[in-house]
């Protein structure tokens, strides 16, 4: 399975990529910043495909961040409660960390007491996605992909 997330911001926009942090295994986590001529700015990191911030002007033109999140990468590793992340392989709880489908019972990783929550111990919010900037003549975005192997997390 290769989930993909694509965010496009139109109207004379720009996209930039910069290092944002390092995983404990040394993998680099990047952050993409998308801006448009109206001052709107979206920041998306490759760890968890997290929307780190979304700044938009109010009716007086003042920018304000409208999403919950942290200013530094380390807090996402130690304090995150799914802020801005892609939840999955399944969003919500699966009771007793198991389910049956077409006569087969699947055992999942229990990470919420005896339950499976938001994709398990290593859900989509805990992996580094591959990021690619998109620029289609002024319409910009970032394509994020992650391949989840069959049986990963249960």
Sequence positions of predicted segments:
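Bacterial N-terminal signal peptides
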Residues: 2-10
């Amino acid at each position: 399975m290769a989930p993909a997330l694509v965010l496009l911001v139109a109207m004379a926009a720009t996209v930039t990529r910069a290092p944002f942090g390092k995983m404990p295994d040394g993998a680099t986590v990047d952050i993409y910043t998308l801006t448009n001529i109206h001052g709107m700015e979206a920041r998306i990191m490759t760890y968890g495909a997290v929307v780190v911030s979304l700044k938009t002007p109010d009716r007086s033109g003042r920018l304000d961040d409208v999403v919950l999140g942290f200013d530094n990468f380390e807090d996402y590793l130690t304090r995150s409660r799914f802020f801005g992340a892609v939840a999955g392989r399944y969003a919500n709880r699966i009771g007793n960390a198991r389910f049956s489908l077409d006569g087969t019972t699947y055992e999942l990783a229990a990470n919420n007491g005896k339950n499976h929550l938001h994709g398990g111990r290593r859900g989509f919010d805990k992996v580094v996605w591959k990021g690619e900037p998109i620029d289609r003549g002024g319409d910009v975005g970032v394509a994020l992909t992650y391949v989840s192997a069959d049986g990963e997390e249960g």
